[in-house]
């Protein structure tokens, strides 16, 4: 979603559905999913509850759509590092870690939207939780693929270690338990990739 800078003027120009999603994101991130009512979202979006229900059948459906947008942003990061470092899987993995590291300052104020949402959605049948679980599974598959392309002998193990570090850094930043989390994150991920031992600096030939 867009930055909150100059929010009133910017939001007024958005179509109704996007305005609702923008307001929902602001409130869900700052106050939590459960605490925010549909009425509060309507007021923030300068619309009505009836208008919200024209676009989203239920509040759960609105939460799920917000999660899809957040997930798409993360998937775009994979696309971006692959485009920036074609045929260089090591740089792709490190670039992904850098994307997370550079976003930690925002997490220190609001926390990871996936982690926060999972804590509020214990029911695994909730549509938003299903979106999160599907996103995480897809993200893992892509990271395993990067590790495999990098020639790591155990791509699944390497991807698991990297995932633990990426997600652990986000939680540690949110609770303030570890300083210089971004710097430490980068060092650990680079160490994982190098430790698994592969000549990753050599571009792999393009397929097709």
Please provide the spans of the model-predicted regions.
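Hydrophobic alpha-helical connector segments
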Residues: 65, 79-106, 155, 159-162
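Helix-turn-helix
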Residues: 2, 19, 23-61, 65
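Amphipathic alpha-helical packing segments from all-alpha helical-bundle domains
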Residues: 75, 91-94, 124-149, 160, ...
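Amphipathic C-terminal alpha-helical segment
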Residues: 103-104, 163-180, 192-201
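N-terminal intrinsically disordered/low-complexity leader segments
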Residues: 1-15, 199-208
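Amphipathic alpha-helical segments used for helix-helix packing
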Residues: 91-92, 106-127
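Alpha-helical DNA-contacting segments of helix-turn-helix folds
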Residues: 63-70, 77
């Amino acid at each position: 979603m867009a930055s909150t800078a100059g929010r009133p003027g910017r939001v007024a120009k958005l179509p109704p559905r996007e305005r609702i999603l923008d307001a929902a994101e602001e409130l869900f991130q700052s106050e939590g999913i459960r605490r925010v009512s549909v009425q509060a979202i309507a007021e923030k979006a300068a619309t009505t509850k009836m208008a919200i229900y024209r676009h989203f059948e239920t509040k759960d459906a609105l939460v799920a759509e917000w999660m899809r947008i957040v997930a798409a942003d993360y998937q775009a990061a994979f696309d971006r590092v692959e485009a920036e470092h074609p045929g260089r899987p090591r740089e792709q993995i490190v670039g992904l870690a850098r994307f997370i590291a550079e976003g930690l300052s925002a997490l220190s104020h609001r926390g990871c939207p996936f982690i926060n949402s999972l804590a509020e959605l214990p029911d695994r049948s909730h549509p938003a939780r299903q979106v999160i679980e599907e996103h995480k599974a897809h993200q893992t598959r892509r990271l395993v693929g990067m590790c495999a392309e990098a020639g790591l002998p155990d791509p699944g193990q390497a991807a698991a270690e990297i995932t633990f570090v990426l997600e652990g850094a986000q939680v540690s930043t949110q609770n303030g338990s570890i300083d210089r989390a971004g710097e430490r994150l980068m060092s650990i991920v680079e160490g994982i990739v190098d430790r698994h031992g592969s000549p990753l600096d050599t571009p792999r030939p393009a397929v097709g």
